Curated annotation (Swiss-Prot):
GO biological process terms on file: NAD biosynthetic process
Disulfide bond sites: none
Listed pathway(s): Cofactor biosynthesis; NAD(+) biosynthesis; deamido-NAD(+) from nicotinate D-ribonucleotide: step 1/1
Reactions catalysed according to its record: nicotinate beta-D-ribonucleotide + ATP + H(+) = deamido-NAD(+) + diphosphate
Pfam families linked: CTP_transf_like (PF01467)
Record-given protein name: Probable nicotinate-nucleotide adenylyltransferase
Entry EC no(s): 2.7.7.18
Length: 174
């Protein structure tokens, strides 16, 4: 994992946000495959303080951040950011995109999302503006293979980890 200053040399950035509640092997597979798909990009992993589309998190923000910090240690081209956690509220994706564009001025900014997010992307805050500012990298999710999206995106296929944080929480009875 790298420092914020190491981001400046990259012309391409990718943002991968999420609750990571809890972190699991599919998250790590997405990170690995994003780095392979975008060999010239720096990947910023952005845990949410609170996902605006989900119930309050099971694990607190600092615990989730520390889990990510341990898991990402030593992975080149990955930066873990606490930008959204420091806001102590649900942060719309467009706000994070604007923050990182202003901070680093990348030529290309990718947004890594799951296929399930395409279904309700139009309901996100300033969705049209968001889609003008980013290129989407979309990873497959079981049950969302046939989603229709009228726009360009880079597919991230073959995430061979049919696990979701929701399923893990459900198995724990929370």
């Amino acid at each position: 994992m790298n420092t914020m200053n190491s981001v400046l040399k990259y012309k391409e950035l990718a943002l991968y946000g999420g609750s990571f509640d809890p972190l699991h092997k599919a998250h790590l597979a997405i990170i690995e495959q994003t780095l392979e798909l975008l060999p010239s990009a720096k990947l910023i992993v952005l845990p949410a303080y609170q996902n605006p589309f989900k119930k309050p998190c099971f694990l607190d923000a600092q615990t989730r951040f520390k889990e990510l910090e341990r898991a990402l240690k030593g992975i080149d081209r990955v930066l873990l950011s606490d930008f959204e956690i420091k806001q102590e509220r649900a942060v719309p994706t467009i706000e994070s995109v604007l923050h990182f564009q202003k901070l680093y001025h990348p030529q290309t900014l990718y947004l890594v999302i799951g296929a399930d997010c395409l279904r309700h992307l139009s309901s996100w805050t300033n969705a049209k503006e968001l889609l003008k500012r980013v290129e989407l990298v979309v990873f497959e999710r079981i049950g969302y293979e046939e989603i229709q999206f009228k726009g360009h995106y880079h597919p991230l296929k073959g995430i061979d980890a049919p696990i979701s944080s929701s399923a893990i929480r459900a198995s724990l009875g929370v």
